[in-house]
A protein has these predicted regions:
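N-terminal segment of the canonical double-stranded RNA-binding domain
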Residues: 2-71
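Short, compact, well-ordered microdomains
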Residues: 59-98
């Protein structure tokens, strides 16, 4: 996976970088949410997210759960912290849409 792929997945959920507050920019100039903004967006949806570096595998793991719940609702693994954060947000948004249907 790459940051470009994670961002494509996020955009496919309807996310827009028009409000670039708390965003960085990829090599193509597209805005993507920083890990701090991703945490804010998870909180607005009623979830908490934790992003950890897994030294043994040289990767990052983002996991999330509903606030007050003991078990993770989902998790992703990626090469970098921003990539894991963006892809986690894409998966959360996709899951929320599916839950509303």
């Amino acid at each position: 996976m790459s940051l470009a792929f994670a961002l494509d997945e996020l955009v496919a959920t309807g996310w827009s970088g028009l409000d670039s507050t708390g965003c960085s920019f990829d090599v193509d100039g597209r805005a993507y949410p920083t890990p701090a903004r991703v945490q804010q967006e998870f909180a607005q949806a009623g979830f908490s997210v934790a992003i950890q570096k897994i030294d043994k595998y040289n990767c990052f793991r983002a996991s999330w759960r509903e606030v007050g719940q003991p078990q993770d609702a989902g998790a992703v693994v990626s090469h970098s912290e921003p990539e894991a954060a963006v892809y986690a947000l894409a998966q959360l948004r996709r899951g929320l849409v599916t839950a509303d249907v």
